[in-house]
């Protein structure tokens, strides 16, 4: 046994609904984890906020809890990888470390009117050309504009003392004791102010959104050295060697390292991301062009991987809505058995627009709806129609990716809590007409962050783990493969 077998990498997965710390060993196995649920705040219709101090407190707590649970010594943790919910952003005071306003969450729609004004002023094409993003309230740029407007109205705030950032920047700043204000290319590419070609903050867009360049974090490669943790957290300094947006981390974990490979994470929303290689692919179907990840080579050159993404704002949250607001199910897991209890949706169809519609429609004003209601409809039909809507929503995006990308999608790799639902996964395979592969490890976001951090410090064994677990055509460690019904019946996909 080598010294590396007594070493561990910690993944910090700071998501929309909760924050986790997971420890991985040298073989890529999970040896322990801790989790804290995150409070959601809805101060007005269409507004969604998080308490940034709660995010940091919980991050620190889960780091300490996972060490205590596993009895691993902090000095055995040789690297940390960080992955976060994207687009969510905030401002904070760099002297006191206090947030100036609750973090505005990616689902928040308060800037939809401002987006409409920019659309009317003719900025849609220019923003897409510079950033690869659709002009929408989803992204950080308009949120930061709103926050800065709010700051101007507060006489108690010193504008010269501001720092801005997405959740990775906020977490990194706190992890390093306020010493490091940086972000990585994957998170920066979701702000709507990063130039997708030059990979630096775009001065024209900063001016458009009235964001001072000096308050923005420094941008660096996803796999690189981001500093060390404050020893007050775990008693030792631990290097932070990888940062990803959550969906890019999942893509990395699935080994989707070349064009034609696609993953879908079913969480609060559903996010389909396809690697498009080292050049930007521009979509003709309103998909997002984004940075997958970046890393520096030994000769100091930068390797960049780009992706096409279809973001769907509601997926697992639709099931939560059935549970929490309508009371149709007692748990998310109960949706599967209830959907199977009927042979069809009974003619009921659901429009999954509880937070507007994302790709490929990008309709900020769309609302959800049940269609086809009759006296014979039961709650089972309603639940089944919601699960089917998630699958058909994903099909729209896959069809758009196939039209935009020269490499056709042959299979879908999945992760996230909602993909535990076998009915949903089988429905997904049926409507796509391609196999759906669900790995044994569903924590792909955390796994991607940990693997990236480990590989950066020379844990080459993890590269072998990539190919054993996720390599195209390999299912040795796949928990379950869902085949379309027509393949099960002996009909090829091409037919």
Swiss-Prot record:
CDD domains noted in UniProt: FGGY_EcGK_like
Binding residue positions for ATP: 16-17, 268, 316, 320, 417
GO BP: any one term: glycerol-3-phosphate metabolic process
Positions of ADP binding: 16, 20, 268, 316, 417, 421
The organism's place on the tree of life at top rank: Bacteria
Keywords from the named record: ATP-binding, Glycerol metabolism, Kinase, Nucleotide-binding, Transferase
Pathway the protein contributes to: Polyol metabolism; glycerol degradation via glycerol kinase pathway; sn-glycerol 3-phosphate from glycerol: step 1/1
NCBIfam families, A to Z: glycerol_kin, PRK00047.1
Family: Belongs to the FGGY kinase family.
Protein name from the UniProt record: Glycerol kinase
């Amino acid at each position: 046994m080598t010294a590396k077998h007594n070493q561990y990498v910690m993944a910090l997965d700071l998501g929309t609904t909760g924050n986790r710390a997971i420890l991985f060993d040298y073989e890529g196995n999970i040896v322990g984890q801790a989790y804290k649920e995150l409070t959601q705040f809805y101060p007005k219709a269409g507004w969604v906020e998080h308490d940034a101090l709660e995010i940091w407190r919980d991050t620190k707590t889960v780091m300490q809890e996972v060490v205590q649970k596993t009895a691993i010594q902090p000095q055995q943790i040789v690297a940390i990888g960080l992955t976060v919910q994207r687009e969510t952003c905030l401002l904070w005071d760099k002297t006191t470390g206090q947030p100036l306003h609750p973090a505005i969450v990616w689902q928040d729609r308060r800037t939809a009117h401002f987006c409409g004004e920019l659309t009317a002023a003719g900025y849609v094409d220019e923003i897409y050309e510079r950033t690869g993003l659709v002009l929408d309230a989803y992204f950080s740029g308009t949120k930061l504009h709103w926050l800065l407007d709010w700051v101007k109205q507060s006489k108690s705030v010193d504008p010269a003392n501001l720092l801005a950032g997405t959740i990775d920047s906020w977490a990194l700043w706190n992890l390093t004791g306020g010493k490091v204000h940086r972000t990585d290319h994957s998170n920066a590419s979701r702000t709507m102010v990063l130039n997708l070609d030059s990979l630096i903050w775009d001065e024209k867009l900063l001016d458009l959104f009235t964001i001072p360049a000096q308050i923005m974090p420094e941008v660096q490669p996803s796999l690189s050295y981001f500093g060390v943790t404050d020893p007050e957290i775990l008693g030792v300094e631990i290097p932070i060697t990888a940062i990803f947006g959550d969906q890019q981390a999942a893509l990395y974990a699935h080994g989707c390292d070349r064009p034609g490979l696609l993953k879908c994470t079913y969480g609060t929303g559903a996010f389909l991301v396809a690697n498009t290689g080292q050049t930007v692919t521009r979509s003709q179907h309103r998909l997002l062009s984004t940075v997958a990840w970046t890393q520096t080579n030994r000769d100091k050159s930068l390797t960049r991987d780009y992706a096409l993404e279809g973001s769907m704002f509601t997926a697992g949250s639709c099931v939560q809505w059935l549970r929490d607001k309508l009371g149709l199910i007692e748990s998310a897991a109960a949706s599967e058995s209830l959907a199977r209890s009927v042979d069809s949706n009974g003619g009921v169809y659901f429009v999954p627009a509880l937070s507007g519609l994302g790709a490929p429609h990008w309709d900020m004003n769309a609302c959800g709806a049940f269609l086809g209601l009759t006296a014979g409809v039961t709650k089972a039909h309603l639940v089944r129609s919601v699960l089917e809507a998630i699958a058909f929503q994903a099909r729209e995006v896959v069809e758009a990716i196939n039209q935009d990308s020269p490499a056709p999608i042959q299979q879908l790799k999945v992760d996230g809590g909602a993909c535990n639902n076998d009915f949903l996964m089988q429905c997904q395979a049926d409507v796509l007409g391609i196999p759906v592969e669900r790995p044994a490890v569903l924590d792909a976001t955390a796994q991607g962050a940990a693997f990236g951090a480990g590989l950066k410090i020379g844990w080459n064994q993890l590269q072998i783990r990539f190919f054993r677990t996720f390599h195209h055509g390999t299912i040795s460690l796949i928990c379950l493969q869902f085949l379309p019904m027509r393949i099960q019946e002996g009909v090829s996909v091409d037919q």
